[in-house]
Design a protein with these regions (language model features):
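Beta-sheet entry/capping signal
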Residues: 11, 38, 91, 98-99
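Short beta->alpha connector loops
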Residues: 18-22, 87, 97
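Generic beta-sheet signal
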Residues: 42-44, 85, 102-103, 121
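Short, surface-exposed amphipathic charged segments that create phosphate/polyanion-binding patches used
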Residues: 55-58, 96-101
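Conserved RecA-like P-loop NTPase helicase motor core
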Residues: 81-91, 103, 109-110
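Short beta-strand scaffold segments in enzyme catalytic cores
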Residues: 90-94, 118-119
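Signature of lipid phosphatidyltransferase scaffolds
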Residues: 100-179
Length: 180
C-alpha cells in the first residue's frame, strides 16, 4: 500500500532500522520523485558499534560510507531530510494517506521475508502517530546534511570575503575622513 500510494502523496516519512545498501530499487525510485514536498528518512546504521577491534574498524568505515553515499540528500530530486538514530529499531512508513507499522525493513530484501504489520488509513491516527512518535524520534536523531552543507559553507565563505572587502573599504574611508 505504501509504494502504490506514493503517486497520490506529497510527503513521505520512513523510519527504519535498515536500508539495504547493495541494491535498493525502492530507494532509487524515491530519488527520482520530483513532485514531493518532503521526504524524511530516519534510519540506524546496522553493524555500527561504539568500539571496534582489529580489521572491523575498516569494515565499519566502509559500511558507514555506503550509507552516507546512499542517503546523500543531493542525490534526491525532491527535498529530503536524512537523520540517523542509533537507538532506532522501529519500522514505520507514512504517506499522506497511509501508515505502515510492522517488521519489514525499507529494502527490496524484505519482500522475500515473512513480515507482519498493520496498515492505518485513518487521518486522525496518522496525525497522532506523527505528533506523538515520529516527532520524538526525529528530535532524538542526528541530521545528516551530506555535501549540501559544503555547498553552503562555500557560499558563506564567498560572502565573508565580500564583507571583509567592504570592511576594509569602510576603514579606509573613515581614516581619510579623520585625516581631513
Amino acid at each position: 500500500d505504501i509504494i502504490e500510494n506514493l503517486d497520490r502523496s506529497k510527503n513521505l516519512i520512513i523510519v527504519t532500522y535498515n536500508i539495504f545498501t547493495k541494491t535498493n530499487l525502492i530507494l532509487e525510485r524515491l530519488k527520482l520523485l520530483e513532485n514531493f514536498e518532503e521526504i524524511i528518512i530516519i534510519t540506524n546504521i546496522p553493524g555500527r558499534f561504539e568500539q571496534y577491534y582489529g580489521n572491523q574498524n575498516e569494515k565499519a568505515r566502509k559500511e558507514i560510507q555506503k550509507y552516507l553515499d546512499l542517503l546523500e540528500p543531493l542525490n534526491f530530486k525532491t527535498h529530503v531530510k536524512v537523520y540517523f538514530n542509533f537507538s532506532n529499531h522501529s519500522k514505520i512508513y507514512l504517506t499522506d494517506e497511509v501508515v505502515y507499522i510492522g517488521s519489514g525493513n525499507f529494502s527490496d530484501a524484505s519482500k522475500n521475508n515473512i513480515e507482519a504489520g498493520v496498515i492505518i488509513k485513518s487521518h486522525e491516527q496518522r496525525q497522532k502517530l506523527y505528533e506523538e512518535v515520529i516527532k520524538k524520534i526525529e528530535l532524538n536523531s542526528i541530521r545528516y546534511f551530506g555535501k549540501e552543507i559544503e555547498k553552503h559553507k562555500n557560499k558563506l565563505s564567498g560572502y565573508l570575503k565580500k564583507i571583509d572587502l567592504i570592511t576594509d573599504t569602510l576603514r579606509e574611508l573613515i581614516c581619510e575622513f579623520n585625516d581631513d
